[in-house]
Amino acid sequence: MPKHTKKDPREGAPSATGEPQKQAAGRKLFGTDGVRGVANQPPMTPEMALRLGRAIAFVASHGKSRQVRVVIGKDTRLSGYMLETAIASGVCAMGGRVMLSGPIPTPAVAQLTQSMRADAGVVISASHNPYQDNGIKIFGPDGYKLPDTAEEEIERLMESHELDEARVVGAAIGSAVKLDDARGRYVVFCKNTFPTALSLDGVKIVVDAAHGAAYRVAPSVFTELGANVTALGVKPNGRNINRETGALHPEHVKAEVLKRGAAIGIALDGDADRVIMVDERGEVVDGDAIMALCALRMLRTGKLPRNTIVTTVMSNLGLERALKAQSGHVVRTAVGDRYVVEAMRNGGYSFGGEQSGHLIFLDHATTGDGIVAALQVLAIMMEEDKPLSELASKAMQRVPQVLENATFATRLPLDSMQRTRVTVDRIEKTLGDKGRILVRWSGTEPKLRVMVEGEDASTIGAYALEIIEAAKQDVAGASA
């Protein structure tokens, strides 16, 4: 069982245009979720990946006299082969031993790193992004994503001469082996999070693996628990990951659920660290609804530490109201599952997640896990003998929420965007305590994201577009 420490991170939610920028000042390579970019273009080049592999092995070797062990997993992108080889070469060049899992979910790498007592785990994936992109995420020996300080040290090493002075030769050069049982280990891990007293015998389930990392393990997990599984998105070709399928396109799962009369649809993203569900009526159940459903069940059974969950500033106000009505509490963080996990560990909380479908059950896993999350929802359905539609609709009443994105060539600091700030301030005064606004730059894409909540959908939609128009004027003015 993963360990989580206790401190108290209860801190105020960020203001509309003042969300904390979690990326450390001066960092060039690492973003909010590792390194990400267009494959074979800076920074996501094999040259960078090789040096990154060397730096990972160097940092992991601190204080150890034995050979460093590193697990490397990937999703199904064509560029995964290129980057996998480069990172593995870098680790071997520093004397490390590489264990290659092949295509496997991000949470599987975290679990394997911990269970196999490796010194680090590396995931090659750009999550929900198209196949042309790729990324690299790093886990520590405890299965948690590396803290900012460790990433900063790795980046510093990559720019220094220390790595060149630490070369090994002869018999000290490392090696790489394939983990033939990696998928089987992870399937067993997932199944063990489902209560042994329950069964999925005969339950009709539709699973969409987005032609991604879970294309083999996801159908296996649910089938081995007895379910009647219809599998979508299980024919990766290196170029179709996330393409009109998976968590970003639950309409395909919806159609199949209605066609087959399934009890639930489970849509994963490319690396299976997040999930969006569809109930038996074809209604989408997002991360907020899943959190409400699971948190209220944990509250009723006394299994929610401090009656508190952790989520981000993007989660719907309805989630907060649902928890508050049952004497529960919500701690909000900046956007990014790593910051949710950070707050959970610091506060001794066990459950949290994001509206986008990253769901973290620290009693089971160290990071967001779409398959594990789906199993917990299925367990509640079995225990309460109720359909997902009933459970989800009763869990929370959603406040109308609008999300708008705009792509910009220039990324200005939010506090310098005067028209945007004035517009947001005016709308916030109009909304009062009946709504919220959040404006932020994406941590992984060149997009400005605007979220507005309020009682009337058409009104808040107009507000969101008004904010984006103000942002366009700010950027145009700065470029003139």
Swiss-Prot record:
Keywords: Isomerase, Magnesium, Metal-binding, Phosphoprotein
Cofactor(s) this protein requires: Mg(2+)
Cofactor binding description: Binds 1 Mg(2+) ion per subunit.
InterPro entries: A-D-PHexomutase_a/b/a-I, A-D-PHexomutase_a/b/a-I/II/III, A-D-PHexomutase_a/b/a-II, A-D-PHexomutase_a/b/a-III, A-D-PHexomutase_C, A-D-PHexomutase_C_sf, A-D-PHexomutase_CS, Alpha-D-phosphohexomutase_SF
Record-listed Mg(2+) binding positions: 127, 269, 271, 273
A Pfam family recorded for this sequence: PGM_PMM_I
Entry's EC annotation: 5.4.2.10
Biological process (GO), any one: UDP-N-acetylglucosamine biosynthetic process
GO terms for cellular component: cytosol
Residues bearing PTM Phosphoserine: 127
Region feature Disordered, mapped onto this chain: 1-41
GO-annotated molecular function: magnesium ion binding; phosphoglucosamine mutase activity; phosphomannomutase activity
Family membership noted in the UniProt record: Belongs to the phosphohexose mutase family.
Protein name per its UniProtKB record: Phosphoglucosamine mutase
Source species of the chain: Sorangium cellulosum (strain So ce56)
Upper lineage: Bacteria, Pseudomonadati, Myxococcota, Polyangia, Polyangiales
Gene label: glmM
